[in-house]
Amino acid sequence: MVSSWPPRKCGIATFAEEAAEFIKKKDEQRPFYVVSHTDGEGDNVFPIIDMSRRDWYEPVAKKIQELDPYAVHIQHEYGLYNYVDENGDSDQNQGFLELLKRLGGLATIVEPHTVHGRLREHEENFVHEMTSLATVVLFKCHYQKWRLGWNFASRGWELPANIMIVPHGARPDKKYAIDEVAALEDELGLSYLKGKHVIGLVGWIQSNKRWDILTSIWEELHDRIKARTGEEWVLLAAGEMRDPNHTKDYVRYVNGIEHLAEKDIAYFHKFIPRGDPYYKVMAVCDLIVLPSLDETQSGTLARIIALNKPFVTTAPLEGLTAQTLESGGGLLFTNRDMLKKQILRLATDESMRWGLGYKLYRYLMEVVSWEVVAGQYYTAYHAAIEEKESGTPVYFEPEF
């Protein structure tokens, strides 16, 4: 696998680590290697992607060819392979394309994490060339494939036939029973939540994750929920910043939480949202709010699904909306008033919360469990290898 890798505070690194765990379980006899950026660590990890070099792809291609792999599974995000020269000019991921050219004799499977429904020109150009160089390309959502066909048609390009849909995986082994929550609260230092219902804002704190949308209306919502149910609900905002460019918004979001904390209706819990703690913090929540303004799919949503937590998220927003509709396990909002209504619906209707949670359980076990997704990865690997051996290009049916 080629990817960013822990301990980097990066959503792709976390994704790749989880994916690798289940890929290895699927075929425990086959060795698994990672070629990562220079900050990657771990067994069988080669940290040689040096983005300070224009030709970073040369040593990477050489190492991969030395390993002589069964297949090369590459995680792609534009920022991971963005070379910037001394004048501040980006190569627009041309180095990534050069890597694919040098791996042309191998079965390459590229998994891009950002494929917008409406592409910018440089994204169209990149995706067009990337799909022509990779053996198989894995999109997360069906809409990304049929929208790409529409986008490419305006340029006179055909929809690539090598695009397979494989959803963002979610762990099938992180569900917690209600009677385990009190112990989790003690373990996490969240004992002040005992006896209260909890709405969670959990994950990496970023500019696009608009926590302030909820904090600005929470006091009113808190009072309305209590008037209707007599129950005490609190807001738990939990996470940490990973990109210093988001410091201004981070401070603003946290200040909003601390203002509510003075009234004892909200709390801020600082932690690194990675590994077991990420799941455990979410597990103490009755429902999750995910107010994001720019995302094609979401690792946060994958964890919400893993825990079967009913949720409310922004729409229309690419993969968030698609998975909410496909799973049936969440509610959507387009403005503040709608957000208020959706939270009120969930907070005042326990049977609805249970119903949405069950739908998420079914969606998890049947569609997005890492055990299911790992099997789809191997289908992609076999298809890519078959193309290299037979010379017959892979073909996946268009969506419509």
Regions found by a protein language model. Name each.
Residues 175-192, 253:
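A short helix/loop element that forms part of the nucleotide-sugar donor recognition site in Leloir-type
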Residues 310-315:
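Short hydrophobic beta-strand element within catalytic cores of glycosyltransferases
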Residues 293-294:
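Aromatic "clamp/platform" in nucleotide-sugar-dependent glycosyltransferases that forms part
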Residues 239, 247-276, 327:
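Nucleotide-activated donor-binding/catalytic signature segment of Leloir-type glycosyltransferases, i.e.
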Residues 191-209, 215-218, 236:
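Conserved donor-binding/catalytic core segment of Leloir-type glycosyltransferases
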Residues 132-182:
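Donor nucleotide-sugar binding/catalytic pocket of nucleotide-sugar-dependent glycosyltransferases
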Residues 10, 351-389, 400:
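A charged, aromatic-enriched C-terminal amphipathic alpha-helix characteristic of glycosyltransferases
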Residues 326-337, 345-351:
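Conserved acidic donor-binding segment of nucleotide-sugar-dependent glycosyltransferases
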